[in-house]
Amino acid sequence: MPRLLLLLLIAVCETVQAQNSSAGSDVSKQGVKEVQVPFASIRPSATIKIGGTADWVLVTDDAIWVASTKPYAVLRIDPATNKIVATVKVSGEACSGLAFGFGSIWVPICGEKPELVRIDGAKNTVSSTLPIAPAAPEGGIATSEDSVWMVTDKNGTLNRIDPSTNGVRQRISIPPGSYNPVFSNGIVWITGVESSVLTAVDADSGKVLESVAVGLKPRFLAAGGGSIWTLNQGDGTVSRVNERNRKVTATIRVGIPGAGGDIGYGGESVWPTVFGVPLTRIDASTNKVIRQWVGEGGDSLRCGFGSIWITDYKKGLLSRIALQQILKQ
């Protein structure tokens, strides 16, 4: 090979390698370095063994609920004692969130026989099994004042379920590839991971009000501070949407792209979690990342009873972290 051509090829190769290296080390894939500390520096007030895995945290007025595998179950924790007080076995893996409403815990199940399990919140037993399947894993479920809401296919069919009959009372078409709903102030909000939008549906009429463009591939979402917050798996950002005018008011660089994760609201802060970066705090008053904890753990969380309840999915653990403690770090 002629020497000049060889040198040119080497130069091109080095340039491509440098570009790939730069892309791979981009801060957007490493979190926000300047505010990072080890997740192991946090001292939980309690850590509870849930099962083979632990996922989908739910806070109710008097309990914390979390799903497990090995066994397939939904466990109830008493926040006064941090003890498991009930283990409700279900037919398969709880794969698309947990919701509370109408005295019941609603549990979408994936696997060989996808269905929707209804748990009596007073008796801690399965009261009904509905032949209504979630659209996909990493989806969600929500309750409003009179209905249960769940997407049941990849085409964007939002089912409105009547809790008095356990039947579907309305089917609403939303953008395909939408899976995760949350209810807030009369509106059901659903993220569209395939279309990168957040869709607002009137919870009274079922009318689609608007689809708002947010960050790339939004999936998990939370309501708080007059806003809806979406965790965008495609670019690792968090989008803030004003509930009143349905406008994006902030796009926050968090640097946590990729599958899985969760997001919650509490202590006037937004709390995303993903593997590798188990916890991030965003100050809702400034839309700034204040602190980011890196290391093992994370994947699902909720705030309640003065605490963050966060799972270590892979180890099957649920930890309780006092908000008063974590807000000082």
For the regions a language model picked out, list residue spans one by one.
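Predominantly soluble domains enriched in secretory-pathway, periplasmic, or organellar proteins
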Residues: 13-329
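Sec-dependent N-terminal signal peptides
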Residues: 4-12
